């Protein structure tokens, strides 16, 4: 089996770095899960954009007299959280839907729960933490209305990310439990090393895709019940 070339992130040619991951929703993710997986990717994009908008909000905060510490931390959050959120929770979700891996689902639930807590803290907006949340923004209206209005944009985005993260977590967890997933299955994958075996992963992916395209049970000898399989 030929190894698929990495294509993400799609870096310009003048940057002397190569993509680190292979990402192909159409060929990797079964039809049943593709929409959910794409929505998780869109949520990651929204979170990354929100961190960028927060950087602008913290710049306005600093110009309005709020100090430089928030702006400095906002730069750190963009540099740190954008790639880490992709690696720590989106990639496990992508691989979980791709190979129906309980271990990767558990990794996603653990890291994405942390992401949800972080999103709530960001939406709250504790002053001095480098985020334009509600406490920081509302409190700054008395100092600089113009800066506070700019800070309001990332505040709303942080709130949206927190709400959407909660919805996404509950939806994926409901699907996982409904499909028979459990912690014991994840522990079994960890013990056997199946979660990192490419041959096992490919077999699981083929099985998952086959299950999506053949919804009827398969038997060694299929009886004729007097109906046609033609649609």
UniProtKB/Swiss-Prot annotation:
Hey, which stretches end up on the Cytoplasmic side?
Answer: 1-39, 89-102, 170-231
Can you tell me which family this protein belongs to? Belongs to the SCAMP family. SCAMP5 subfamily.
Gene Ontology biological-process entries: exocytosis; positive regulation of calcium ion-dependent exocytosis; positive regulation of cytokine production; protein transport
Decide whether keyword Cell inner membrane is in the record. Answer: no
List the protein's name: Secretory carrier-associated membrane protein 5
Q: How does it sit in the membrane?
A: Multi-pass membrane protein
The protein's gene is named scamp5
Q: Membrane side Extracellular: which residues?
A: 61-67, 126-148
Q: Which organism is it from?
A: Xenopus tropicalis (Western clawed frog)
Q: Which residues cross the membrane?
A: 40-60, 68-88, 103-125, 149-169
Q: Provide the protein's localization.
A: Cell membrane; Golgi apparatus membrane; Golgi apparatus, trans-Golgi network membrane; Recycling endosome membrane
């Amino acid at each position: 089996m030929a190894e698929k070339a990495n294509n993400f992130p799609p870096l310009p040619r003048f940057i002397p770095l190569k993509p680190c991951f292979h990402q192909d929703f159409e060929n990797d993710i079964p039809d049943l899960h593709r929409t959910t997986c794409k929505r998780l990717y869109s949520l990651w994009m929204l979170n990354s954009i929100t961190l960028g908008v927060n950087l602008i909000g913290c710049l306005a905060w600093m110009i309005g007299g709020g100090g430089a510490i928030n702006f400095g931390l906002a730069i750190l959050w963009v540099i740190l959280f954008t790639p880490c959120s992709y690696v720590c929770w989106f990639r496990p979700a992508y691989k979980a839907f791709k190979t129906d891996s309980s271990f990767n689902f558990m990794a996603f639930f653990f890291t994405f729960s942390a992401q949800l807590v972080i999103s709530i803290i960001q939406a709250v907006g504790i002053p001095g933490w480098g985020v334009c949340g509600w406490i920081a923004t509302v409190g700054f209206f008395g100092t600089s209305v113009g800066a506070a209005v700019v800070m309001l944009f990332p505040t709303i985005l942080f709130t949206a990310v927190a709400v959407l993260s909660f919805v996404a977590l509950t939806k994926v967890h409901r699907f996982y439990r409904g499909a028979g997933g459990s912690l014991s299955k994840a522990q079994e994958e960890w013990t056997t090393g199946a979660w990192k075996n490419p041959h096992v992963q490919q077999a699981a992916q083929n099985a998952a895709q086959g299950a999506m395209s053949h919804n009827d049970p398969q038997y060694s000898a299929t009886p004729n019940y007097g109906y046609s399989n033609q649609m």
